[in-house]
Amino acid sequence: MAQGPSQCPALLGAPASTTDGTQEARVPLDGAFWIPRPPAGSPKGCFACVSKPPALQAAAAPAPEPSASPPMAPTLFPMESKSSKTDSVRASGVPQACKHLAEKKTMTNPTTVIEVYPDTTEVNDYYLWSIFNFVYLNFCCLGFIALAYSLKVRDKKLLNDLNGAVEDAKTARLFNITSSALAASCIILIFIFLRYPLTDY
């Protein structure tokens, strides 16, 4: 029985099927490029930094045996931007640096600030002189005032206040000189009156 024209594939222009199992090569589309698939498996974190590079791992893997099945065509991806292409190339087997090491490199070193304080050790506080005047020559409590200023000088020296320590040291010296001079004058007058009493005149 003869077949009609609608049932004959040759009349419709359809290609005849092949029996050898081969497949026609796919023609790449316009505006597309080929990108190999990234290696399977999740990253191992910091241990991936010290592991073997991908090139050595690929060389150690056994070669695939030839099979009778036809080779599979590579996967076709659409056009991507430049940044996406760079990321794809990095994921295709190029070893990347550890992210923890990258974070350490980006961290800036903290700056060390050294504060230089003025030298207050050369400021004289007249502490011993003030104690002597307070104990022996405390004329009108001037020795006590001088001792108070001497203690203020010591406190300001601990606080590294050079200007305040110098001013209080000058005041303590002034009170010490005044107390010593007045007390010494009183002692001399007392000795004179004891040596030459007023009844002799």
Swiss-Prot record:
Pfam families attached to this UniProt entry: CD225
Principal subcellular localization: membrane
Ranges of the Cytoplasmic topological domain: 149-173
Bilayer-crossing regions: 128-148, 174-194
Any single Gene Ontology cellular-component annotation: plasma membrane
Extracellular side: 1-127, 195-201
Region (Disordered): 1-23, 60-88
InterPro entries: CD225/Dispanin_fam, IFITM_antiviral_protein
Cellular localization per UniProt: Cell membrane
Membrane topology reported for the UniProt record: Multi-pass membrane protein
Family recorded in the similarity comment: Belongs to the CD225/Dispanin family.
Name used for this protein in its record: Interferon-induced transmembrane protein 10
